[in-house]
Amino acid sequence: MGDSVLSAIQQTITQRKSANPSESYVAQLLHKGEDKILKKVIEEAGEVLMASKDKNPSHLVYEVADLWFHTMILLTHHDLKAEDVLDELARRQGLSGLVEKAARTES
């Protein structure tokens, strides 16, 4: 289910790249450029932190969804997709975090 939801959202965001900014929130963000998108990602990340401190699971889920959505817009701005992140996560699956970190510091 998760992949299909992310794929559908990704498809919509990608379509909004060519939409009229006066008719779409996503098109507005993409039209305004990277700095505006980054400000929104920072704002949403802060809201995730606050929701975590609130100890309210449903509020945390809501805010993480906002953060994911806005990072997907950022990815689209860079002609990347959520699938690229999922591929990276799949690559890391089964790797020890400590081993992976050590490999990064050696190179």
Curated annotation (Swiss-Prot):
Coarse class of the protein's main subcellular location: cytoplasm
Domain of life: Bacteria
GO molecular function: ATP binding; phosphoribosyl-ATP diphosphatase activity
EC number(s) reported in the record: 3.6.1.31
Compartment(s) of residence: Cytoplasm
UniProt feature coiled coil, ranges: none
Stored InterPro entries: HisE, PRib-ATP_PPHydrolase-like
Pathway entry: Amino-acid biosynthesis; L-histidine biosynthesis; L-histidine from 5-phospho-alpha-D-ribose 1-diphosphate: step 2/9
Any single Gene Ontology cellular-component annotation: cytoplasm
Reaction(s) catalysed by this chain's protein: 1-(5-phospho-beta-D-ribosyl)-ATP + H2O = 1-(5-phospho-beta-D-ribosyl)-5'-AMP + diphosphate + H(+)
Biological-process GO terms, alphabetical: L-histidine biosynthetic process
Enzyme class: hydrolase
CDD domains recorded: NTP-PPase_HisIE_like
Keywords attached to this entry: Amino-acid biosynthesis, ATP-binding, Cytoplasm, Histidine biosynthesis, Hydrolase, Nucleotide-binding
Gene3D superfamilies reported in the protein's UniProt record: MazG-like
HAMAP family: HisE (MF_01020)
UniProt cross-references to NCBIfam families, sorted A to Z: histidine_hisI, PRK00400.1-3
Family: Belongs to the PRA-PH family.
Name of this chain's protein: Phosphoribosyl-ATP pyrophosphatase
Organism of origin: Neisseria meningitidis serogroup B (strain ATCC BAA-335 / MC58)
Gene that this polypeptide is encoded by: hisE
